[in-house]
């Protein structure tokens, strides 16, 4: 019986794996079995760390905002509370960028919002 040569499909599949793993080191980029295992591990790590990256950046932004507001005698929680009361929809990223580039600007915004909220509170109680 004649030996059947395999078609191009398996070779094409392996080529895709090798292209994905071409930057891996050692046998992880050369051997088929370890390449497939490393590809699966890499994809699992990428999926897991996408969520982790969002958490880490949010924590970093909160830390930066808190550092600048505490320098000026405020606190992060008070700033966020004032933002919500003033109906200013800002995510954590924008105030964090303001805190890095110009901390005084963030301080002025927080003071302005705080004073505006106090005036609104007085007028509604009268």
UniProtKB/Swiss-Prot annotation:
Main subcellular location: plastid
Intracellular or extracellular location(s): Plastid, Chloroplast
Gene3D superfamilies, alphabetized: 6.10.160.10, Ribosomal protein L20 (1.10.1900.20)
An individual GO BP term: ribosomal large subunit assembly
Transmembrane regions: none
A single cellular component GO annotation: ribosome
Domain of life, per lineage: Eukaryota
InterPro entries tied to this protein: Ribosomal_bL20 (IPR005813), RIBOSOMAL_L20_CS (IPR049946), Ribosomal_protein_bL20_C (IPR035566)
Keywords in alphabetical order: Chloroplast, Plastid, Ribonucleoprotein, Ribosomal protein, RNA-binding, rRNA-binding
Gene Ontology molecular functions: rRNA binding; structural constituent of ribosome
One Pfam family this sequence matches: Ribosomal_L20
Keyword Nucleotide-binding annotated: no
Function field: Binds directly to 23S ribosomal RNA and is necessary for the in vitro assembly process of the 50S ribosomal subunit. It is not involved in the protein synthesizing functions of that subunit.
PANTHER family, A to Z: 39S RIBOSOMAL PROTEIN L20
Family to which the UniProt record says this protein belongs: Belongs to the bacterial ribosomal protein bL20 family.
HAMAP family assigned to the protein according to its UniProt record, in alphabetical order: Ribosomal_bL20
Name of this chain's protein: Large ribosomal subunit protein bL20c
Lineage per the UniProt record: Eukaryota, Viridiplantae, Streptophyta, Embryophyta, Tracheophyta
């Amino acid at each position: 019986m004649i030996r059947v040569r395999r078609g191009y499909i398996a070779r094409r599949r392996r080529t895709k794996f090798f292209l994905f793993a071409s930057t891996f080191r050692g046998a992880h980029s050369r051997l088929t079995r370890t390449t497939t295992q490393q590809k699966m591990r890499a994809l699992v790590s990428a999926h897991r760390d996408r969520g982790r990256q969002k958490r880490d950046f949010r924590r970093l932004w909160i830390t930066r905002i808190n550092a600048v507001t505490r320098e000026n005698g405020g606190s992060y929680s008070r700033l966020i509370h004032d933002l919500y009361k003033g109906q200013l929809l800002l995510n954590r990223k924008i105030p964090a960028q303001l805190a890095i580039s110009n901390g005084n600007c963030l301080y002025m915004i927080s003071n302005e919002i705080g004073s505006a909220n106090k005036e609104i509170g007085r007028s509604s109680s009268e």
